[in-house]
């Protein structure tokens, strides 16, 4: 039975019809940058989630240089909001210089006005992938899969502090 027919029958039976949700749009529509031709041109960042033995959540922010495939930073915490993302990026920019592009998905931490404003002030262009298409950020997704398989799945961390020490 199609959704339209189900909604029509619910309405006829005077049942409450669920409201349809609008899809979130991409914050900025910039073309996807070409593959980098050297180091420090395109960075990509994303989150990986896991849990400790004591049921504390781990949220890992991974930042990768797409040319060298080097993990520039893995930040581990229970919660990483936009201000923490800015702090991590500012630390990396001061150490390595600013990239031309920063590729990410459309997570709330990445499309927040604070992060977008900071990137604009630093002269870094954003490159958001299309919603629901993680293969457009293949370098990061590949790294995150290997990070999960080789680090997170092999270790059973007793606490968040132990995970920070081992991962970072």
Segments and roles (model prediction):
Residues 1-168:
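Charged DNA-binding/catalytic regions of mobile-element recombinases
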